[in-house]
C-alpha cells in the first residue's frame, strides 16, 4: 500500500508494552495540522532571510512533519530512539529533510531495539554526527551558529524514567539519563521533577536550543511543566488544548503551545481554546481502543471551550 499504510503497520508493530515504555503516543493528524500553523507563525516572526532549523528530537515515525511543505521540510532535523520507528522515519524523510540523527551507517551497527546515538537525553547527543547535505554536521554546530534560528517542534514522551531500562537494553547502572542527572543538579526547584522524561526534554530544549529571541518551541505536553514545575518561563505566543484521549491514552488535556525565547516570570495564567476531533458530526472516540490509531485526515477540530 501507500506510505500511510506502512506507518499504520509500524505503529501497530510497536507493541503497546514497548510504546508504553517509551512513553510514546501517536499524534492525531487534525492536531498536527493545527500545530503546523504554530510552526509557520514562528517562521514568519523570524528576521527576513534568516536561516532556521525545525528540530524534532523525538519524532517517532514523523507524524508531526506530515503537513510541512517541501521548503519547510528542507529545514527539518529529525531523531528518534526506537529502531523500528527510526527506519520508518529514515525511509520516509531521507533526501527531504536537512538532517537525520544518527546516520544510517551508525544504525546499521545497531543491536537491540534502541538506536545507538538516538538518545536525545544522552551526554553525547549534541556531538553525534547527522546524516545531512547541510553545512552543520552535528547539533552542537547548529547551536554554535548564531545565524540560524532553532524552532523546536516536539511531542515528547511522558513516561517515568524507568522506561529507559527497558528490556535490558540499558544496564541498570545507566538507567538515569545524563540530562536527568544534570537537571537534578542545576534545576532551581524540586529535583524530583527531573525524574519525569517530559521535564527532561523540556529542560534540555531550554538549556541547549533556546539561545536568543529568534528561537521558539512548539510543544505538545500536559501543562504542568509550566504551571507547577516552572519550566518554560517564556513568552507564550499562541496555542490550543488537545484531548490526550485522542492519542491512545487516558482523557486529559495536552497544551500545544508556541513559546518564544524571551523571559516571562510574570504571567500566571494563559487562556486557550480546547479543541476536540469530530467526524461525521460525531465526537471521535478516545482511549486505548483500536479506532484511535488512525484518526482519518478528513476529521476536523471543533472548538469546545476556552480554558484558562
What function would you assign to each model-found segment?
Residues 92-142:
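S-adenosyl-L-methionine
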Residues 65, 159-163, 211-212, 225-230, ...:
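Short catalytic/ligand-binding loop motif for oxyanion handling, primarily in non-cytosolic enzymes
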Residues 186-244:
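Conserved Class I SAM-dependent methyltransferase catalytic core
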Residues 59-62, 81-84, 155-157, 161, ...:
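An acidic- and aromatic-residue-enriched active-site/binding cleft used to recognize and process polar
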Amino acid at each position: 500500500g501507500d506510505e500511510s499504510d506502512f506507518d499504520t503497520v509500524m505503529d501497530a508493530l510497536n507493541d503497546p508494552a514497548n510504546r508504553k515504555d517509551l512513553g510514546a503516543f501517536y499524534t492525531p493528524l487534525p492536531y498536527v495540522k493545527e500545530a503546523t500553523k504554530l510552526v509557520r507563525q514562528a517562521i514568519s516572526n523570524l528576521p527576513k532571510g534568516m536561516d532556521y532549523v525545525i528540530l524534532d528530537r523525538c519524532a517517532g515515525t514523523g507524524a508531526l512533519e506530515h503537513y510541512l511543505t517541501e521548503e519547510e521540510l528542507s529545514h527539518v532535523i529529525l531523531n528518534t530512539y526506537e529502531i523500528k520507528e527510526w527506519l520508518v522515519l529514515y525511509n520516509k524523510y531521507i533526501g527531504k529533510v536537512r538532517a537525520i540523527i544518527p546516520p544510517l551507517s551508525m544504525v546499521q551497527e545497531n543491536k537491540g531495539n534502541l538506536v545507538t546515538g538516538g538518545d536525545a537525553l544522552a551526554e553525547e547527543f549534541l556531538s553525534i554526527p547527522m546524516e545531512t547535505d547541510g553545512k552543520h554536521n552535528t547539533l552542537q554546530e547548529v547551536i554554535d551558529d548564531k545565524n540560524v534560528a532553532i524552532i523546536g517542534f516536539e511531542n515528547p514522551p511522558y513516561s517515568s524514567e524507568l522506561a529507559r531500562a527497558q528490556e535490558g537494553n540499558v544496564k541498570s547502572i545507566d538507567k538515569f539519563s545524563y540530562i536527568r542527572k544534570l537537571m537534578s543538579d542545576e534545576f532551581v526547584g524540586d529535583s524530583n521533577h527531573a525524574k519525569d522524561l517530559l521535564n527532561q526534554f523540556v529542560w534540555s530544549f531550554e538549556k541547549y536550543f533556546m539561545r536568543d529571541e529568534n528561537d521558539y518551541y512548539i510543544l505538545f505536553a500536559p501543562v504542568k511543566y509550566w504551571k507547577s514545575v516552572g519550566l518554560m518561563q517564556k513568552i507564550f505566543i499562541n496555542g490550543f488544548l488537545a484531548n490526550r484521549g485522542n492519542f491512545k491514552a487516558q482523557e486529559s488535556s495536552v497544551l500545544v503551545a508556541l513559546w518564544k525565547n524571551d523571559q516571562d516570570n510574570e504571567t500566571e495564567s494563559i487562556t486557550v481554546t480546547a479543541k476536540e476531533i469530530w467526524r461525521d458530526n460525531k465526537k471521535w472516540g478516545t482511549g486505548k481502543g483500536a479506532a484511535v490509531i488512525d484518526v482519518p485526515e478528513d476529521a476536523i477540530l471543533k472548538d469546545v471551550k476556552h480554558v484558562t
